[in-house]
């Protein structure tokens, strides 16, 4: 049997590193279909830190796509697992037959599914991408994204799968030893990416709570984002006093980020699509409820796991937030499907499907 090849077709260092380390640590030892990778980006020590994997690095999207297409044409039994699919050349290859549907398995990351960019080239490309998506052999995604995808592509097979968020299961009870009282602290957004719509989110928080809460905005990722960070800072200072606005412009190490999250009372995420599952998982693990846009279908995954969900359209106050905290504290977090290690079973099944080992 031909070994499955995994494709990380865009240079997204943080997510790519997370996937590679997860496969190295959790999957490679038990499946030959979890070891071969083609990745856009620099090695930066990844080969050394993932010795169980065979990783081929490419300088850009185009060179990787050309190599994938050549492999697909040379051996029609070769199957590929695309982790997040932001590479236009690969979509066009699927549409034109360069890659066959039986070779193309796609794990939806969120941004690669929704059509939110307003630029002309995106508007011209989206209809072609939609046509190509009809030819995918199988999609893997959250419950909400599967539902969203099925509205336009009902004939494409879909399987539940969660991004392998880095989590320590021993911290599932960490919320129980923190007393929540006094001024609330609200986390706004999951990164410095513009998709968080930080300024609109700050306005929404201010409309709900006024200048009575402390707002923390993590913007250390992506790099070279100083102009936008300053734009958000100035907008924030027009709404909140300096003592109530904390904008983090430096990237935090994982333990420092966890410590920051534990000081929060609420997460506020205004984006109208599924994103930031990693941050949501860590907040939920810490017993901190989240406010979501009703257009973000991840609320379906949360309610399926009996987790409280607040929406940006709700009338919010401290009593409602404290009640959501109480409800969240009563949930057995060891049973949540999108938590580690529970998502591991979904990955084992996804590998078997993509490799053709199970129907």
From Swiss-Prot:
Keywords: Cell inner membrane, Cell membrane, Glycosyltransferase, Membrane, Transferase
A GO molecular-function descriptor: fucosyltransferase activity
Taxonomic superkingdom: Bacteria
NCBIfam families, per the entry: PRK02797.1-1, PRK02797.1-2, PRK02797.1-3
Catalysed reaction, written as an equation: beta-D-ManNAcA-(1->4)-alpha-D-GlcNAc-di-trans,octa-cis-undecaprenyl diphosphate + dTDP-4-acetamido-4,6-dideoxy-alpha-D-galactose = alpha-D-FucNAc4-(1->4)-beta-D-ManNAcA-(1->4)-D-GlcNAc-undecaprenyl diphosphate + dTDP + H(+)
Location in the cell: Cell inner membrane
GO cellular component: plasma membrane
Annotated membrane topology: Peripheral membrane protein
Listed GO biological process terms: enterobacterial common antigen biosynthetic process; fucosylation
Protein name stated in the entry: TDP-N-acetylfucosamine:lipid II N-acetylfucosaminyltransferase
Family classification: Belongs to the glycosyltransferase 56 family.
Role summary: Catalyzes the synthesis of Und-PP-GlcNAc-ManNAcA-Fuc4NAc (Lipid III), the third lipid-linked intermediate involved in ECA synthesis.
Pathway the protein takes part in: Bacterial outer membrane biogenesis; enterobacterial common antigen biosynthesis
